[in-house]
Regions:
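Non-catalytic accessory regions flanking glycosidase/transglycosidase catalytic cores in CAZymes
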Residues: 1-174
Length: 174
């Protein structure tokens, strides 16, 4: 469906290589494969399989954005409850980890046993709200992790960090 050849230079450290693939057809059983000419170790830092054409050019699939638009909702909240709470205070979502180049954003483990890339971050959320002419409702952590999963309250110091993150998010949005 698509192919990209990358000439890799031997290195003892991590090097970034970019490759853009455009599928020439649709195959619901298609696979993404890496092939090497010789024995080597490959470390993948960030892979994104996003469509070339997105809603207003801002990264969201057109069909999903249109579904949201057709709800005629007045606002969208970001992020969701369990994501903002996290499993514990180390992986509770914070504003600063959701902005900047997507390949530099840290991923985090979610309570549903998979990871989020934070590819849809705060900036993309604000852009989506603007594109859909909806109000943005930012949800911040109130100093505790998910109570349904034996979570607990954060220390005063950690809670202050999350409060500062919320203020930074508001400043960013304005």
């Amino acid at each position: 469906l698509g192919r990209c050849n990358i000439a890799v230079q031997q290195s003892s450290g991590y090097r970034r290589y970019d490759c853009e693939l455009t599928a020439v057809d649709t195959d619901f059983k298609g696979r993404f494969s890496l092939c090497c000419d010789s024995d080597c170790t490959v470390t993948l830092g960030f892979i994104s399989l996003m469509p070339e054409k997105t809603f207003k050019g801002h990264g969201l699939r057109e069909d999903l954005a249109m579904m949201l638009k057709n709800t005629h909702a007045k606002f969208i909240r970001f992020p969701g409850g369990c994501v903002v709470e996290g499993i514990n205070e180390q992986n509770a979502l914070s504003f600063s980890r959701t902005i900047g180049p997507v390949w530099e954003r840290p991923s985090s483990q979610l309570m549903w046993h998979y990871r989020t890339t934070n590819g849809l971050g705060f900036h993309e959320f604000l852009q989506l709200c603007e594109d859909l002419e909806m109000e943005a409702m930012y949800v911040c952590n109130c100093g505790m992790s998910c109570q349904a999963r034996h979570g607990g309250g954060f220390s005063d110091e950690e809670t202050k960090k999350y409060l500062e993150e919320a203020l930074n998010a508001l400043e960013y949005a304005l």
